[in-house]
Amino acid sequence: MAGCFRFVKEENTMTWRIVHICQSEKMQLKLDNLLIKKMGQDYIIPLSDISIIVAEGGETVVTLRLLSALSKYNIALIVCDNEHLPTGIYHSQNGHFRAYKKLQEQLLWTQEQKDKLWQIVTYFKINNQQDVLSMFEKNIDCIQLLANYKDHIEYGDKTNREGHAAKVYFNELFGKKFVRLTQQETDVINAGLNYGYAIMRAQMARIISGYGLNPLIGIFHKNEYNQFNLVDDLMEPFRQIIDVWVYQNLRDEEYLKYEFRLALTDTLNAKIRYGKETCSVTVAMDKYVKGFLKCISDKDTSKFYCPMVSSVEWS
């Protein structure tokens, strides 16, 4: 079974398996189940148990009936290329029974609201970057510089503290010669970061869609070609979970091997401190989006917390 797929259980979520499929021949719908065909063997998983499917292998056939069912169950499908790197996400566009009302509300978000929320999200992100450098006992001057950036973020981050912090952070974490690449992955560090970020992005997309939000309409990102502007906004403080895993596991490696890809998928099940409780990353994401919505509807930031990356424990 390991050659066909792996799955892991998520804590306290209505859908709880992340299915990693490698070199299967066909994925199709059988009643309300995912049917995986591999070398004459059939593997069946109830769709109600699945949150994400990661599919590798260029010869796999996926039926339209299955794609329709994945949308119905709000299951994200991540498709990987021949280098095993994620290149696309298929997700539901109808995850909420009052989608039109939610869209109307989202379109009424004011620029002031969006700028304030982006200020908070940027603070969370730089705070976690600072904590990561502290975890690994990096240069104290760089850590203090991030602290300074964090404490001087304007509404909407008009002075781009996020961008300045990112340069300092990556150069200190992975070395002065490190260059962050998102398209032409030339090294195992970038490959690991991109793979892990794609997993986080898919999970955030399905959670956001499940709450009736349109992922196209962000609070900061506004790329007309990006279907996930809001996802890319909100996932920023969760990226550092992947940074920590990559730093701990890939610095001495040459390739992003299969076991590493599985482990990166499993980061969604890592334990993390969110507010006053410790929960899985997936549960923290869900609570985080709820807190974001509370900020929008009631101007109440008391339930919108920074996920504490320094507390992460791998499952």
List each language-model region with its residue ranges.
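Active-site helix-to-loop segments that bind/position phosphate- or nucleotide-bearing substrates
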Residues: 15-18, 22-25, 72, 84-315
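Glycine/small-residue-rich interface belts in oligomeric ring/scaffold proteins
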Residues: 48-98
